[in-house]
Amino acid sequence: MSLEKGLINSKIIKDHGLTKSEYKLILKILKRKPNLLELGIFSVMWSEHCSYKSTKKWLKTLPTSGEYVICGPGENAGIIDIGGNDAIVFKMESHNHPSFIEPYQGAATGVGGIMRDVFTMGARPIANLNSLRFGDISNNKTKNLLQGVVKGIGDYGNCVGIPTVGGECSFHKSYNNNILVNAMCVGLVKKNKIFYSKAKGIGNPIIYVGSKTGRDGIHGATMASAEFDDNSIDQRPQVQVGDPFMEKLLLESCQELMKEDAIIAIQDMGAAGLTSSSFEMASKGNCGVKLFLNEVPCRESKMTPYEMMLSETQERMLMVIKPDKKQVTFDIFKKWGLDAKEVGYLTDTGKMQMYFNNNLVGELPIKPLADSAPEYDRPRKKKESKTIKVRKRKLKIKNVFLKMISSPNHSSKEWLFRQYDNMVMCDTIFSSEESDAAIIRIHNSKKAVAISCDCNPVYCNSDPKLGAKLAVAE
């Protein structure tokens, strides 16, 4: 068996979003030239979206531990102890680029992705929130983006049956070509029923479950790391397509399997799909993986190993299970009508070995891709605080008031909020429409959780540090 060969040139390297220095590092790591499949895997794993190579330096400075922190950065979602045997699992994530290119699907899959991150930890989602920024509302492009994003968020959350209880939306011309779509999900879990993504147990089977793999979203992580403009419409095939009804089946089936003491590790196939989920689980467990790509359920014919590994088809999970629990695992997923296949097993090699048609088509060391992406300290200069100069002039209070309330930022957002079901599950005491924060009750207790999602971009633009402080304070 030999690795599949393919010509790699400077154009292909650039098209994969890799720099010359990064490619030289790849050659140093492998001690040989990569084939196209391997280059594609480096591309997505070392993308800004997956590796945080430009922001990791700064993210490391944030406080991440505390008396009530059960799980900080590094897992699918954060976990906070709320007393007794209860904990809150939460995740907030941006889906800006996909939503700019294809607003409905971009926003919908943003919601779906964070919900999977939350229930992967063993939690049941109890609330969704969002924070949205759009350009000049008089711009037709902005109107189309607003309508698509809001409908995508509402349709996905409503169909899965999770209340969207809060959020915010504002407009400014600076967002004309760079909208922000931040989705948040909150879930409830028992502290003794938390699941993690650390793979362990040499020889343990790796199970794929969920939607069949298609060609949608290939290089979505790389696309999400690039700059874009009005010509980005050509990138629509890289935007994932969501299926909220499949998400509901996946949620309920995973919750059922979690009661069977079958799961050793579980990971959502999010950005970079099968690649990121398999590499991340193996890296955390310091083990290797053998993947048999012929076993991957595909919905399109003649899919290549490159397409299977880089597809970002939504509503998919990868898990390592106990060998004696394979039958109960397949029985549960069959009951829910889901595709579930054994696609590989754990090894002690520290390498990802990918086979297709009985041939070894790719072999890569796991740690350098999952944990050792290049980190950058980008050039920067201190930004002077901006102050708004107010000219002295005679103003009529009535005119000032009318101008303020005529701004779309101060207008009623009822049209937007009414597209979100905030009472499904019947646990919403208050939505943020009714108070400064949404309040969700916790079953079988006298506890409730207050949730808010706010930020003032004017403050952040004027003074980023002070603006960030005020966002936390708010």
Which sequence ranges carry the predicted segments?
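Glycine/proline-enriched, intrinsically flexible loops and inter-domain linkers
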Residues: 1-474
